[in-house]
């Protein structure tokens, strides 16, 4: 219970928080995407369309940031977005929830980063952030802002020019547009609103989560087998006790009823202890990495509880029935 809950609910928590940050962070009226990449001049063309107040292209990629110190130092992957336009234009279509500094100075040699990365790298506004661009090039831009919605949007935000020459594909993947009409923007790519874009991203995240769920299922299955074997051996070791109960007048139904209550007690204690261990692990972990509490889907947690109770009941009842046959 503890192991499976920790693995599964860690992912559901991250997905739930990321989805919430994405929905709250995109303030654009329209989101234009294209799996093959948007036209090079997509942002310029969109900005010239009637009614458009701001159009910002995003080049999404990954960078590496050194975190820790001494023997505990390592390179941490961070989602990065290269912004076409100024920080002021970005603020019109994306709310990064800036905690320190300002996006107004965002530009060549200057970046904004998520607060979790700032804590991990022990840097703040005014410091230099050492990082490795996608092609391995080292850079040390100045941090001009620290924000809070990096999990749902991007951990590192920098100007597009700083990334364009260091990625395998220099085409923007997303275009955020404030104002204008979706019909006119359709010439640039697939147009949707914030809700539709967030739903699509959430679906992609759920499809990618199956590897985590599979690992949790396999490891949880091994733990369940060990627990079931323990319960089965415990019941078989009590064959004389069960026989004595039958000899003193207890009916087969009464003995099985007693064992069912015992299995219910064992499963309840296991669920409570497992939940407590998972909570003790998840709460500080999620608070430290996201600043929010873990998200536990009620139906998923209920299925874990039902599975624990069902396994305990079967592991006790089936061997008990076999042991009681000789006393029938």
Language-model segments: residues:
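Interfacial "coupling" helices/loops that link adjacent transmembrane helices in transporter permeases
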Residues: 226-271
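Small-residue transmembrane helix packing/gating motifs
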Residues: 24-27, 146-181, 192-198
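Transmembrane alpha-helix boundary/anchor motif
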Residues: 5, 9-13, 225-230, 276, ...
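Short helix-loop junctions at transmembrane helix boundaries
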Residues: 269-310, 317-328
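Alpha-helical transmembrane segments of integral membrane proteins
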Residues: 2-3, 209-229, 266-274, 300-304, ...
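Peri-transmembrane interface segments
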Residues: 190-223, 236-237
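Hydrophobic secondary-structure segments that place a key small or acidic residue at a functional site
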Residues: 100-162
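Juxtamembrane segments of multi-pass membrane proteins
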Residues: 1-117, 127
